[in-house]
């Protein structure tokens, strides 16, 4: 679903800290810290994980999975483009 490095990269793209992401997602800061400390796919309470992913997507982040069409292979994140944008 999402990896710890993807979460950190998504926050960096948005210019927000862990506290802000926790507030957007409605979870605790320690929850965000535990998720981001994961070296691979984040594991944990599915409800909390879903809240974080949805908060990042609402904020404009697109999560790139292993099978996503991309110029490079592997997981990543990018900002969504506005409708009618490049």
What function would you assign to each model-found segment?
Residues 7-20, 81-83:
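Short basic helix-loop element that most often maps to the first helix and adjoining turn
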Residues 58-86:
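Short, charged recognition helix plus adjacent turn
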């Amino acid at each position: 679903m999402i990896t710890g490095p993807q979460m950190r990269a998504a926050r960096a793209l948005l210019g927000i800290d862990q506290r802000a992401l926790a507030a957007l997602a409605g979870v605790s800061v320690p929850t965000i810290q535990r998720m981001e400390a994961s070296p691979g796919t984040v594991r944990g309470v599915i409800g909390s994980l879903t809240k974080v992913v949805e908060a990042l997507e609402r904020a404009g982040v697109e999560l790139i999975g292993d099978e996503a069409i991309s110029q490079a292979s592997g997981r990543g994140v990018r900002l969504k483009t506005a409708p009618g944008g490049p």
